[in-house]
Regions:
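Iron-sulfur (Fe-S) cluster-binding segments and ferredoxin-like electron-carrier domains
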Residues: 67-79
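Residues at alpha-helix boundaries and short interhelical turns
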Residues: 20, 41, 58-62, 76
Length: 113
């Protein structure tokens, strides 16, 4: 399968630096909102990253998936737990979403190394 989670994440990070330099106030507002949403509250930060992974799959976002997988791995989620959670996205989005679950599996393979 032609999918490069590490390359996708690297390119995303490079482009985000350009966006930060071009529109710093808007970029900072986005980062603050992201930090607020992903910080622990009633739900743990770990749980929120799993929810973000499932949301990324449901949204069919190939750029979001490796970033969410990396955060999930760093938070201690197992491959089995992540894939099981992603099946909820398939329940909501149907078989076309299953193709994005394969991107999760690929990202887990590459980012676990």
């Amino acid at each position: 399968m032609q999918y490069d989670p590490k390359g996708t994440t690297g390119e995303f990070n490079r482009l985000m630096v350009d966006i930060k330099n071009t529109i710093p106030e808007e970029y900072q507002a986005f980062i603050q909102e992201k930090s607020k949403v992903t910080s622990a509250g009633e739900l743990s930060e770990k749980d929120k990253w799993l929810l973000l992974l499932v949301s990324s799959v449901t949204a069919k976002c190939p750029v979001c998936i490796p970033r969410a997988v990396k955060h999930c791995l760093d938070s201690g989620w197992s491959k089995k737990e992540m894939l099981e959670a992603c099946m909820v996205a398939v329940l909501v989005g149907g078989s076309s979403v299953m193709t994005f679950v394969t991107l999760v599996a690929k990202a887990i393979e590459e980012l676990s190394e």
